[in-house]
């Protein structure tokens, strides 16, 4: 009876013990270099020859194989004991020979590569064994472990078959040396870290190829970034162009609307002038039943006749107001210390034909009505009558054609007839100067008192009317004509100024917006103070940002007229303050 030194089991014969030990070896054998287990003896031999050929010299390997496989049958106990010792020696070699630091010194990917390599070797060994088993005519001895181990080896990498193990070893070392690098104890092989990702390479050339891949990828990414950046810039440029186009289109639209609004406001929208507006209003009155058709035709005929001869028909005129004011201040006004009145002047109010834009023309009619009643201006205004509005427009165009105020003419397109264009202080000055009437423009361009008031304006008008008066009578009828007063959007005519007993000043103003029925209330004999409310304007009533006045001061000589025409090429006004 034979007893197994490994597990204690007893067997009857040496072949049974040998088979029993082989079972132990197949189940328990472990690679002494890398601790690979779970494979049979033939597989572990093939594994050691191919993977650990540098650590396992041929002669040592032969001794191990002989110790395990070539024991004599006569030395039963000794062989079994030796076999057990070899087996335990193999186990101890696996524990002592495998470097403890190897797993730590190698990167994880190197370990993965070796495991894959071991699995491949084992697979190849098993394939070789199966092919041997399938060949017919082989005896049991020929299929033994010796023949499997020393049969013509095949390269596990490229499949080449060599005549012996030494030739295969040389082949693997020379052809597949880079694949057989394994961790060795106390091995100081230089390693190369990738500067871009930290990968450890065992060969400088491999590192160079690896870094080149990084650079190619970076270059490709940069190229893609440049393409993307270029595409983004192009898209941004297109969006900016579209935004600029829309903004310019919107600005152009707003500019056109504002320009058209200004054209309508100043009567330059080609919608007709005085004549067309008068006819439209009269037709509207007929349609509403406020005017009989016969009256429409009668008034139309009168209007056409007035335009044809160039003289105002007088239907909007109110005369005698200055005389009525003189009577009032003489008999009734007890709160007034002194009053200065201009020369006689007629009031003209707007009609259907010039409503909304004709205040400047109506104020010129008032001023001219005063000048025509003065002998001082008889020479320069000889044979004139108060003109109608279309005639005044024609007279201003004639003054422009003479060379007066070219800048103002260009702003109005050198045309007033047939339009509803407003006129202001510059046009009044131009027209009077062309008629040889001496006048001046004074610009009160900013307020000179609290709350936006203009006390300097009142002081200037007081000095204008009181300059030729000695003493302080209550009522002073001066020889000074009325003053044209302009502010933004409207104009009026100053016909006098009164000083209260408390020394406050109040202007007396004719407004072309006031209808004749209101002005005629001033002609009553028993006129009340409340009737003057529409004429009186205190300092607190004039709070526009800017005021301009045109004051008449006499007659120009022909030479002075030429000089003033030359000066009007660059029009300037006197500024106060």
From Swiss-Prot:
SMART domains: ZnF_C2H2 (SM00355). The record marks 486 as: Involved in the stabilization of negative charge on the oxyanion by the formation of the oxyanion hole. Its EC number is 3.4.19.12. Gene3D superfamilies: 3.90.70.130, Classic Zinc Finger (3.30.160.60). The active site is at 359 (nucleophile), 490 (proton acceptor), 511. Pfam families: Peptidase_C78. Disulfide bonds: none annotated. The motif interacting with ubiquitin (MIU) and ZUFSP ubiquitin-binding domain (zUBD, also called ZUFSP helical arm ZHA) are responsible for binding the distal (outgoing) ubiquitin units S1 and S2 respectively. This is Zinc finger-containing ubiquitin peptidase 1.
